[in-house]
UniProtKB/Swiss-Prot annotation:
Keywords: Cytoplasm, Methyltransferase, rRNA processing, S-adenosyl-L-methionine, Transferase. PANTHER family: 12S RRNA N4-METHYLCYTIDINE METHYLTRANSFERASE, S-ADENOSYL-METHYLTRANSFERASE MRAW. One of its GO terms (biological process) is rRNA base methylation. This is Ribosomal RNA small subunit methyltransferase H. Its EC number is 2.1.1.199. GO terms for cellular component: cytoplasm. It is found in: Cytoplasm. The gene is rsmH. SUPFAM superfamilies: Putative methyltransferase TM0872, insert domain, S-adenosyl-L-methionine-dependent methyltransferases. Specifically methylates the N4 position of cytidine in position 1402 (C1402) of 16S rRNA. It comes from Desulforudis audaxviator (strain MP104C). HAMAP family: 16SrRNA_methyltr_H.
């Protein structure tokens, strides 16, 4: 990889900065640093007295971001980690409460376009899909080892794929002949499994299955839920969390998590007064997700499915806990 050639076009940058609202001298965390496009926008707002913590599992992304953000010196701290380790990372850096946390979920353009990473179905490459190539199961492990019914359930749950049973059956048949070890071969098997009438319109027939495998390999939804819960604890009063998601599973999880922390009462209906003692911790800022404009989609088609949600830590939470 050449650092200057790392492809990164930040999605909805203007909207991210609007809802994150970085303040001079503040501390902000980019949990999915990528090439550093969003981080650069934040750094321009917070100035020399601020701090930007960038987290990413991908060593290539960290190297590219370090190159891009080098001019900000001690105002940038970059860490290779899974964002489910957010609390541990900030504790180690001794940042204290932070004023904003950003997530730009999913796979980056660089990862999709780098054939050797095995995320894409347009090129033939080893069937990998790990965000951190240093360890863990690969997509090939799942495709070749999972029982057919478990593979079908995985594709259905994480890919919302209508033809999951048929795809799993075709995969099980083909792997008996020879292990499926490349993205190209898996894409061909999926294409054969999906009926011709369903292939005539819409995205590539392999898209949903590849999404499902990637989510499973990296435990993306589990990591997101864990990290969002930590983010609520780590935010300062009035601090904001902004999330860009790219498919319905991510967006639903973000929406439900924000609602969980914004609820005023969990008592059963019918009680004359609240007895649960639940205190809302977030104010939801985006009643509906924000989406990219037509001009951005034309310039960057991969932004098409993006949805932005934002929430703010309530100031009265700290007062209720006796924090002055």
């Amino acid at each position: 990889m050449t650092l200057t050639g790392f492809r990164h076009q930040p999605v909805m940058l203007r909207e991210v900065l609007e809802w994150l609202d970085p303040k001079p001298g503040g501390t902000y965390v980019d949990c999915t640093l990528g090439g550093g496009g969003h981080a650069l926008g934040v750094l321009e707002r917070i100035g020399g007295r601020g701090l930007l913590v960038g987290i990413d599992r991908d060593a290539d992304a960290l190297a590219a971001a370090a190159f891009r953000l080098a001019g900000y010196g001690d105002g940038v701290r970059l860490v290779q980690a899974d964002f489910r380790e957010l609390a541990a990372v900030l504790r180690r850096l001794e940042t204290g409460p932070v004023q904003g946390i950003l997530y730009d979920l999913g796979v980056s353009s660089h990862q999709l376009d780098t054939a050797s990473r095995g995320f894409g179905y347009q090129q033939d490459a080893p069937l990998d899909m790990r965000m951190d190539p240093g360890g863990g199961v690969t997509a090939a492990d799942l495709v070749n080892r999972l029982p057919e019914d478990e593979l079908s359930d995985l594709i259905k749950a994480y890919g919302e794929e209508r033809w999951s049973r048929r795809i799993a059956a075709f995969i099980a048949r083909e792997r008996k002949r020879e292990p499926i070890l490349t993205t190209g071969r898996l894409a061909e098997v999926i294409k054969e499994a999906v009926p011709a009438r369903a292939r005539r319109t819409g995205p590539h027939p392999a898209r949903r299955t590849f999404q499902a495998l990637r989510i499973a390999v990296n435990d993306e939804l589990g990591a997101l839920k864990t990290s969002l819960h930590q983010a609520v604890d780590l935010l300062d009063a009035g601090g904001r969390v902004v999330v860009l998601s790219y498919h319905s599973l991510e967006d639903r999880l973000v929406k439900d998590t924000f609602r969980e922390f914004a609820v005023h009462c969990k008592c059963p209906p019918g009680l004359p007064e609240c007895r649960c003692g639940v205190v809302p911790r977030l104010d939801i800022l985006t009643s509906r997700p924000r989406v990219p404009g037509e001009d951005e989609i034309a310039a960057n088609p991969r932004a098409r499915s993006a949805k932005l949600r934002a929430a703010r830590k309530r100031a009265d939470v700290l007062k209720d806990k006796g924090v002055k």
